[in-house]
Amino acid sequence: MAERNSRKVYQGRVVSDKMDKTITVEVSTVKMHPVYGKRMKYSKKYYVHDEDNTAKTGDIVRIAETRPLSRNKRFRLLNIVEKAVII
């Protein structure tokens, strides 16, 4: 049997948990500008499947790529790295 391709794993911050079983995670990366060589900060938002509604806004989470779960969801929650501090 052929080996399955490795799935992408990202770490990011939960920016929204208002949907049922879905969270929005913002993943930030740093890339070099091709001409000027300056380090630029980029961020991208992903819809992530959260089966038990455990993640809350502000948490740092790890997400993994998976099969399409809906029109926009292609990631699932692996674990919560750090809980948000409630003030």
From Swiss-Prot:
Q: Which UniProt keywords apply?
A: Ribonucleoprotein, Ribosomal protein, RNA-binding, rRNA-binding
Name a single GO biological process: translation
The membrane-spanning stretches of this chain are none
> What is one GO cellular-component annotation here?
cytosolic small ribosomal subunit
- Could you name the domain of life of the organism this protein comes from? Bacteria
Pfam families, alphabetized: Ribosomal_S17
The record's GO molecular-function terms, alphabetically, read: rRNA binding; structural constituent of ribosome
* UniProt KW Ribosomal protein keyword: yes
Similarity comment text for this entry:
Belongs to the universal ribosomal protein uS17 family.
Q: How does it assemble?
A: Part of the 30S ribosomal subunit.
Function per UniProt: One of the primary rRNA binding proteins, it binds specifically to the 5'-end of 16S ribosomal RNA.
* HAMAP family from the UniProt entry: Ribosomal_uS17_B
Protein name as annotated: Small ribosomal subunit protein uS17
Annotated source species: Lacticaseibacillus paracasei (strain ATCC 334 / BCRC 17002 / CCUG 31169 / CIP 107868 / KCTC 3260 / NRRL B-441)
| Gene expressing this chain | rpsQ
